[in-house]
Swiss-Prot record:
Binds DNA as a homodimer. The modification Asymmetric dimethylarginine is found at residue 389. GO terms for biological process: BMP signaling pathway; cartilage development; cell morphogenesis; DNA replication; exit from mitosis; gene expression; generation of neurons; glial cell fate specification. The gene is Nfia. GO terms for molecular function: chromatin binding; DNA binding; DNA-binding transcription activator activity, RNA polymerase II-specific; DNA-binding transcription factor activity, RNA polymerase II-specific; DNA-binding transcription factor binding; RNA polymerase II cis-regulatory region sequence-specific DNA binding. Residues 189-211, 259-345, 352-371, 437-509 are annotated as: Disordered. GO terms for cellular component: nucleus. Pfam families: CTF_NFI (PF00859), MH1 (PF03165), NfI_DNAbd_pre-N (PF10524). The modification Phosphoserine is found at residues 258, 265, 280, 287, 300, 305, 319, 360, 469. This is Nuclear factor 1 A-type. It comes from the Eukaryota. A motif (9aaTAD) lies at residues 394-402. Residues 437-457 have a biased composition (Pro residues). Belongs to the CTF/NF-I family.
Amino acid sequence: MYSPLCLTQDEFHPFIEALLPHVRAFAYTWFNLQARKRKYFKKHEKRMSKEEERAVKDELLSEKPEVKQKWASRLLAKLRKDIRPEYREDFVLTVTGKKPPCCVLSNPDQKGKMRRIDCLRQADKVWRLDLVMVILFKGIPLESTDGERLVKSPQCSNPGLCVQPHHIGVSVKELDLYLAYFVHAADSSQSESPSQPSDADIKDQPENGHLGFQDSFVTSGVFSVTELVRVSQTPIAAGTGPNFSLSDLESSSYYSMSPGAMRRSLPSTSSTSSTKRLKSVEDEMDSPGEEPFYTGQGRSPGSGSQSSGWHEVEPGMPSPTTLKKSEKSGFSSPSPSQTSSLGTAFTQHHRPVITGPRASPHATPSTLHFPTSPIIQQPGPYFSHPAIRYHPQETLKEFVQLVCPDAGQQAGQVGFLNPNGSSQGKVHNPFLPTPMLPPPPPPPMARPVPLPMPDTKPPTTSTEGGAASPTSPTYSTPSTSPANRFVSVGPRDPSFVNIPQQTQSWYLG
């Protein structure tokens, strides 16, 4: 795409990468033009003149492609949050033509109706979600008050919340048909087409000051018919920068699931990584009940056995063995063996790997590929995969190293801490056999458990020196697990020598 420095992590989501080539360039001009007209009216208490509106239109049409694409990326990120998580996959597949159209439900507002969003920053004009979809992906110039003109198709099962662009149509009334004939006839007469009625057939010459046929209609817009059709059919990514080509726009890394195509290099500083991870987590928490988009990749590493990628259950997806298929070939579902190998390939995405520009991806031959290439092949200082949100140096690993060091040093030895937190050394424990290794690390929360001490066996005391001796008394039993590291000592326990005579509890971490 254009310069990665202009994008944030949210603006580079695979959801956005897949849908951006299908956004019409007219949407940017139309939304901004309506906002400019509204601001002008509120400021000057009069409507914008034709000359001023035409100047604004020309300014918006000549805007840099980077600005248009950045706006479209932010708007797609908003729409993604407003679409229910279970329908986001269907939305991408249907808009990109990979799947027949199906209903895509959005999150309702407080009254259970279609939500409204502002398509621009610091704009007081709100648009219904279905209106936004029609303008964004079909390029139809609708006003924000044209929500009543939208008609859902008979195949739509939930017309109140469905935002599927293929299920949304625009009702055409008699006046629209009448004006369509007028515009068509007038436009054809200007092109001097002999097969169409001439201008004299539809326009009466004004007599005695009376208005003719065409004089009865006043066009309020600044777009001509041919210009409106042309700009409404142009994709927003048509005008691109040096790092963005139309050949790349025909595909998306949304369907190229190889680790090399999906990974981005990690940031150079951990502080930047932490900031972006926090921002991503906050954005994911905006929508109630929202889950990561990739069920097989956006979960925690421990839940990999409970979830599978949506490619495995999608009946319309090709099998991993028939990756490079022609457009005429049919779909086939993956076999069980292929599904297992596919899950193995998807497991590679759970590993946070630092890759450079020439790093070879750790992919298996069964990795799911589509006959497309990702939009961006250059790594940048950002994440594009929702699964890689944690730093490679996990705090859990450090906690394990702190609590359970090497087995050779800890076998049969347990550290002891004073109440003031200073360590007093280690001593061999006769009650813990040497070959017994400590179990896995304990959970983060452990309850204090009293340490049972036998009264019959003599305690192991330290040498002369008491508490200042480097070998302090330490007690344990084979039945005591390192998970129970809270020791409660009472005043009646004769096993400890240099302990104050009151009940104390501390943590032997």
